[in-house]
Amino acid sequence: GAARRLDRIIMVVLALGIGFFAVDKFVLDPARDAALEEAAEERGRTDAFVQSYGDKSIAVLPFADLSQDGDQGYLSDGVAEEILNLLAQVRELRVISRSSAFRYRGEVHIPTVAEELDVSYVLEGSVRKSGDLVRVTAQLIDARADAHVWSENFDRAIDDIFAIQDDIARRIVDDLKIHLAGSGPRSVRTDPETYQLYLQAWHLLEVEQTSSELAEDLLQQALERDGDYLPALILIVRAVFWHTGNSEDDRYTFDKGIARMRGYVDRALAIAPGNSAALAHRGWMAFWYGNDLETFAEYLNRALQNDPDDEWVLYVAMVNSIRFGRFEDGIAFARARLQRDPLCSGCLYNWMKAAMILGRYDEALAASERRMRVADGGWISRGDIYLLKGDAGKALECYENQAEEPVGFLRSQALAFHEMGDFDARDRAIEALSRIDSDYAFEAMAEVQAWIGNVDSAFEWLGRYLDPDQPNFIQVLSGVLVNPFLRNLHDDPRWRELREQADMTEERLAKIRIEMPP
């Protein structure tokens, strides 16, 4: 039913967003010296990257909504986002991504922001809209000294909003003494009504992360007004994705949803053949809905060549490199995004997991600690590192800090108690876990049974978890294939059959690579 489909969709999206279990305790031993050396090298690489920009680094904070009714947050955030995007096109400038910069909302201590994001300048501002008039106030701050470089009001008609954004970006570039060969980046133009419809949808999807159906309706209205407005064509793909195969609405059957998404991507590529987001969308759709890994890699590599700093493309490259068994590449993509998105919890999560795969447990623990400073939870993952490192007692202490999540906690208890030799406690946890009816619990039961050596039972639970008739079967399976707690299944003929059934053999995956641009 719809609930089970939603369960599966959410699980795959979480995998895309925050990673998946990884590492094989039977193959790799901890390499403490290598881990410490790698961590030192990483600090050196990060410092060198940041220092290469000198003082040319900036964070654009969310602008305040000063409208009379306080209902223009979509516009104030949207203006800040557009200025950020314009500045990000200047290769000589290190610009912190929205996902990190927009965490600092409201009254903030600028020197603290500068230290945590490692930037020299901060842009903050406000937007006040009244009828067809808009006032944008922007102020550039020398973040280290907490001193204003300049502050200015831009009073214009709403029709001139793009010019305001361009003017602010250009002034920042000039003040930071960055020489541009041309006139500098310019906002993608459309009419004011289309732009406001787009910003409302963008705010729902990207800031509030709610109401994708309403967002799609707003984007449809925007495209009816301006069918060539590229940002709307890119964003509506994400809106449609959330409901495809997970709605009673006939528009969102898999066949219809996929066809609509492909149509929007084709229109976007016809307008801008080199648009990185559109290329990446074309690629992941080939993988997600067609198991065409070769086309996926081709389009993602093109996207990275065209814009190696695109944060979403880097994220997709990171997650899927790890899924394809290229763990070092996954870490490299995580590092690349973290250089401009230092608070990216999903990047830190995937880095942690990939480091575990490589047996670099100290590096994994460092990534885990850093992630837990910017996101809630994380105790189960941290416990997994200790478990794989051979410290089941420490692992259990970590697991108990996240006992409110029943499936993950029971699964983790069972693993730890097994390693500690407390088989009665292990069996009680397994019994409780077996009574939970969810896909997540089915996978967890397969993990536990495989870990303790009950291979037949593990395959039975895995069979309940995997549904080859589901259109997202390949994505679910790709997470299973790198799950370390299923390692005991790898020598069983049924494991090879599972890979062959889905055409996800090691031989095929070895030929797929997403390349980090030079």
Please identify what each model-predicted range represents.
Residues 237-239, 353, 411-423, 475-493:
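TPR/TPR-like alpha-solenoid helical repeat scaffolds
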Residues 446, 450-454, 460, 465, ...:
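C-terminal accessory segments
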Residues 230-231, 276-277, 310-312, 343-348, ...:
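Boundary/linker segments of alpha-helical solenoid repeat arrays
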Residues 362, 378, 383-459, 463:
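Helix-coil-helix junctions within alpha-helical repeat/solenoid scaffolds
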Residues 10, 14-369, 373-374, 379-386, ...:
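Acidic, proline/glycine-rich low-complexity intrinsically disordered segments
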Residues 480-518:
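Terminal, low-structured helical/coil segments at or just beyond the last alpha-helical repeat
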Residues 304-306, 336-343, 369-376, 400-407, ...:
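Solenoid-like repeat scaffolds
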Residues 1-10:
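Membrane-interfacial entry segments at the cytosolic side of transmembrane helices
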